[in-house]
């Protein structure tokens, strides 16, 4: 979000691919994600060898941790990024491509806890792709290798990629004799006793004797259903044990128990997805293709034997159907019974599979399309408490920034102190962060294996008993609550700042340039004020050091005093609409001076480069104007041709805007001015425009507890005016579809309190009415031109913000979708569109511009 405050200077790591970048790589997720941007063709041999050595060591360590110890050290995203980079390095520098490379290994080694057993036939892995382009290249490559006619359909199967553990079941004469882990693909661990406790795995194959082979290897995946996973974690919590981070870890820990009785209690499940060696009555191995024509026939055979198959498998015949499968389960990842991380595509015909063959680790006839990672690992730097707009006091995890599921995550809520304890997290832990779809990021839990050797760096979180903003004693609202609250709703600076942030949100008044920092500057400008003059360093914005150096000690000048405490411009949201530029001129905020390390390196052209690296805060603070510029020269006035405008005497003229203040003159009489920043001007313009908004947005802006945008929309549609809503009783409100007793009581209580003499909520309502804020709905009788239609907006539109475009679609009965799929009816493309426009072209979805969008809103069509 844009903000009226001056943003910190952007500082970068070393240039990707440079020597210092290679040497500074760490085995953390944020560094691993940079590997995707590396152009390996620009590396020299020495650089490639160094990078390969670092990555291969980490990948080997990850393989042992994942496959042998069942205690992953890295997230799937980081592992995939490192493995993918190794493959690209080996392709560009063939001398690195040796049989010992981790890219040629199927999994890990095997542990000493179970007997090592050789698989009758190698248990292979799958190659991964991460984009439609890579998937298309594989698909086209398969057709080319098979010399498949362009006009002929190529049957394939699509299967959800279960996030579990690979298992090889060996049946002899229909009896389960062994269950083996994948291990390194050649040798696995014998966990037969534990496998026998999994109810979905038959100990005897069903069917007449002639239909059962002498020996068969059935490959599949052991997993834990979401319901069973949640029950297991609840049981762990009740017993005081830490919860599992995800179902895969839970399944792994359960399957490899030394005591099968524990495995039996964990309710594991199994789906078959492959076939290995097959021996029939003659006693001789028979190629599967001679007995079963295709992959789907094998699954039919399994079902007859009583072996479970995933109900999500599909048979497809073209690339578009593959995309349909990927898109569907991409949108419904959380709706099926187990965790999944991709879609597996296989050539269905087993004879064609044999023709295509395999590499040393993976078949060429199958590929795994991996969805963007929903889980990554990162460092928990701290836990702070945040006071919300309704007084709820929430612990917030401060994270080492990491990219997950489409965005960078640096903080996430921990809900309450009970939740912190339940998850078993300590400040300093490496933690798992999950972001499924568009939901708020969740801190799942700690990576326990990462604690070893770092115990001294870990500490427990302690929940405060007083409000960190106003020092009011915190309390529970009612018995049994887990959430502490600050009861000082009127005067708590943190609550006021959060309410201002809320009213500026897209779904409220949509004041884009009133961001978080501006809200704090308006309501609590002394936030971060240092406790003593020893930490006050006027004018010091950064402290530059050489690599390895510590900043020199700071000594405050003699006689220096902290400036007087400022009174906030806003003591209530009531006077928001009365703000003028002049009110903001003397608002200053506290900024911490940053420690900047300047690193030097020589680029590929022999030229010395400097890279500025932010090390963190220095503990020294200075003040900066929040909304106005500092004193500066007035700019020269320019004409349409960008030439300086001069007066009749030939002297240059200067640009002094009406809201600027001339504070003096420099050389040649040039005015010295102070003026609002452009962001400030935009913020004030947006505040003025917000007066003319719809009632539903006003209701969101009022921060009524339990009233979010959907409820506000329902209320505005039902009551039409604020006065009518304010007069409604809780009983009347509860009669409205979608308004439950708790919401109805909250709304009625809000307006009852607002009517009390002197109540601050009443003052807000009266002030907004006096300022001309709209208190009625705008859409009565609006034609439902887009009913049942799905519209995606991408890029910047001239006359619509993203939120107002979404609102325009929804008010006409349409669905404003955030992603493009085959169900999308139109994609509206503005300036600088993203990948959604490209995907729309690939899928043949109609693309329209803003003018056509106006027509669409009015008529329901673009003709």
Swiss-Prot record:
UniProt enzyme class: ligase
Matches recorded under InterPro entries: BRCT_dom, BRCT_dom_sf, DisA/LigA_HHH, DNA_ligase, DNA_ligase_AS, DNA_ligase_CS, DNAligase_adenylation, DNAligase_N
Coiled coil: none
Cofactor(s) named in the record: Mg(2+); Mn(2+)
GO terms of biological process kind: DNA repair; DNA replication
Region listing for Disordered, in residue ranges: 237-256
Assigned EC number: 6.5.1.2
Catalysed reactions listed for this entry: NAD(+) + (deoxyribonucleotide)n-3'-hydroxyl + 5'-phospho-(deoxyribonucleotide)m = (deoxyribonucleotide)n+m + AMP + beta-nicotinamide D-nucleotide
Pfam families for this protein: BRCT, DNA_ligase_aden, DNA_ligase_OB, DNA_ligase_ZBD, HHH_2
GO molecular function, one term: DNA ligase (NAD+) activity
Active site: 161 (n6-amp-lysine intermediate)
Residues that bind NAD(+): 76-80, 125-126, 159, 182, 221, 346, 370
Keyword terms: DNA damage, DNA repair, DNA replication, Ligase, Magnesium, Manganese, Metal-binding, NAD, Zinc
CDD domains recorded: BRCT_DNA_ligase_like (cd17748), LIGANc (cd00114)
Ranges of compositional bias, category Low complexity: 241-253
Gene Ontology CC terms, in alphabetical order: cytosol
Domain (BRCT): residue spans on this chain: 781-863
Binding site for Zn(2+): 467, 470, 486, 492
Reported function: DNA ligase that catalyzes the formation of phosphodiester linkages between 5'-phosphoryl and 3'-hydroxyl groups in double-stranded DNA using NAD as a coenzyme and as the energy source for the reaction. It is essential for DNA replication and repair of damaged DNA.
Protein family per UniProt: Belongs to the NAD-dependent DNA ligase family. LigA subfamily.
Protein name: DNA ligase
Organism: Bifidobacterium animalis subsp. lactis (strain AD011)
Gene name tied to this protein: ligA
């Amino acid at each position: 979000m844009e903000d009226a405050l001056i943003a910190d200077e952007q500082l970068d790591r070393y240039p990707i691919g440079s020597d210092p970048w290679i040497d500074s790589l760490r085995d953390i997720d944020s560094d691993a994600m940079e590997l995707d941007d590396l152009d390996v063709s620009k590396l020299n041999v020495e650089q490639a060898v160094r990078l390969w050595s670092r990555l291969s060591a980490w990948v080997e360590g990850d393989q042992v941790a994942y496959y042998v110890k069942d205690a992953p050290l890295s997230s799937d995203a980081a592992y995939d990024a490192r493995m993918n980079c190794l493959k690209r390095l080996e392709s560009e520098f063939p001398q690195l491509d040796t049989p010992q490379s981790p890219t040629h290994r199927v999994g890990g080694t095997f542990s000493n806890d179970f007997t090592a057993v050789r698989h009758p036939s190698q248990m292979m892995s799958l190659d991964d792709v991460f984009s439609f382009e890579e998937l298309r290249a594989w698909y086209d490559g398969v057709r080319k290798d098979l010399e498949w006619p362009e006009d002929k359909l190529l049957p394939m199967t699509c299967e959800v990629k279960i996030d579990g553990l690979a298992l090889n079941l060996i049946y002899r004469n229909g009896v389960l004799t062994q269950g083996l882990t994948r291990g390194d693909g050649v040798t696995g661990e014998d966990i037969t006793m534990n496998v026998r406790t999994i109810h979905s795995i038959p100990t005897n194959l069903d069917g007449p004797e002639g239909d059962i082979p002498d020996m068969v290897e059935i490959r599949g995946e052991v997993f834990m259903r979401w319901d069973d996973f949640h029950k297991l974690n609840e049981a762990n919590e009740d017993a005081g044990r830490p919860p599992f981070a995800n179902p895969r870890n839970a399944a792994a820990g359960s399957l490899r128990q030394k005591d099968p009785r524990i495995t039996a209690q964990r309710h594991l499940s199994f789906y078959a997805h492959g076939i290995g060696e097959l021996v029939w009555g003659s006693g001789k191995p028979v190629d599967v293709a001679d007995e079963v024509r295709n992959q789907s026939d094998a699954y039919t055979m399994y079902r007859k034997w009583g072996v479970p198959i995933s109900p999500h498998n599909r048979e497809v015949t073209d690339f578009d159907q593959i995309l349909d499968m990927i898109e569907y389960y991409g949108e419904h990842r959380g709706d099926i019974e187990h965790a999944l991380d991709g879609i597996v595509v296989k050539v269905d015909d087993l004879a064609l599979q044999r023709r295509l063959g395999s590499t040393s680790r993976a078949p060429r006839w199958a590929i795994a399309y991996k969805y963007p990672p929903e889980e990554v690992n990162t460092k928990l730097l701290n836990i702070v408490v945040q006071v919300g707009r309704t007084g709820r006091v929430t612990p917030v995890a401060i994270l080492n920034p990491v990219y997950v599921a489409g965005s960078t995550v640096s903080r996430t809520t921990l809900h309450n102190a009970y939740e912190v304890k339940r998850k078993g997290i300590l400040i300093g832990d490496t933690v798992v962060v999950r972001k499924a779809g568009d939901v708020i990021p969740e801190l799942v839990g700690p990576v326990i294996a990462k604690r070893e050797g770092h115990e001294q760096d870990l500490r427990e979180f302690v929940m405060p008993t007083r409000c960190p903003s106003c020092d009011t004693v915190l309390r529970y609202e009612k018995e049994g609550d887990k959430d502490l609250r600050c009861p000082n709703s009127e005067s708590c600076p943190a609550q006021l700042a959060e309410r201002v942030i809320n009213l500026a949100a897209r779904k409220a008044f949509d004041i884009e340039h009133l961001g978080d920092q501006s809200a704090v500057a308006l309501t609590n400008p002394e936030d971060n004020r240092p406790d003593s003059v020893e930490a006050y360093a006027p004018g010091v914005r950064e402290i530059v050091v050489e690599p390895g150096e510590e900043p020199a000690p700071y000594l405050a000048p003699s006689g220096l005093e902290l400036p007087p405490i400022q009174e906030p411009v806003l003591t209530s949201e009531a006077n928001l609409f009365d703000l003028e530029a002049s009110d903001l001129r003397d608002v200053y905020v506290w900024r911490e001076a940053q420690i900047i390390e300047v690193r030097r390196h020589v680029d590929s052209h022999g030229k010395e480069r400097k890279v500025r690296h932010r090390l963190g805060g220095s503990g020294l603070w200075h003040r900066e104007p929040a909304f106005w510029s500092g004193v500066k020269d007035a700019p020269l006035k320019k004409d349409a041709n960008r030439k300086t405008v001069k007066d009749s005497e030939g002297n240059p003229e200067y640009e002094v805007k009406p809201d600027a203040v001339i504070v003096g003159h420099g050389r040649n009489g040039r005015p010295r001015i102070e003026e609002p920043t452009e962001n400030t001007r935009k913020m004030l313009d947006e505040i003025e425009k917000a007066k003319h908004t719809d009632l539903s947005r006003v209701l969101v802006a009022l921060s009524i507890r339990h009233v979010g945008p959907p409820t506000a929309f329902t209320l505005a549609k039902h009551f039409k005016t604020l006065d009518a809503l304010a007069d409604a009783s809780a009983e009347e409100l509860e009669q409205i579809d979608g308004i439950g007793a708790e919401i109805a009581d909250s709304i009625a209580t809000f307006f009852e309190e607002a009517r009390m003499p002197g109540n601050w909520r009443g003052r807000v309502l009266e002030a907004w009415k006096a300022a001309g804020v709209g208190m009625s709905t705008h859409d009565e009788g609006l034609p439902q031109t887009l009913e049942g239609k799905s519209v995606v907006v991408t890029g910047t539109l001239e006359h619509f913000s993203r939120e107002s475009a979404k609102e325009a679609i929804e008010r006409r009965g349409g669905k404003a979708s955030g992603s493009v799929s085959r169900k999308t009816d139109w994609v509206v493309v503005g300036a600088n569109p993203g990948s959604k426009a490209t995907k729309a072209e690939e899928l043949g979805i109609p693309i329209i511009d803003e003018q056509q969008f106006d027509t669409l809103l009015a008529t329901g069509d673009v003709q």
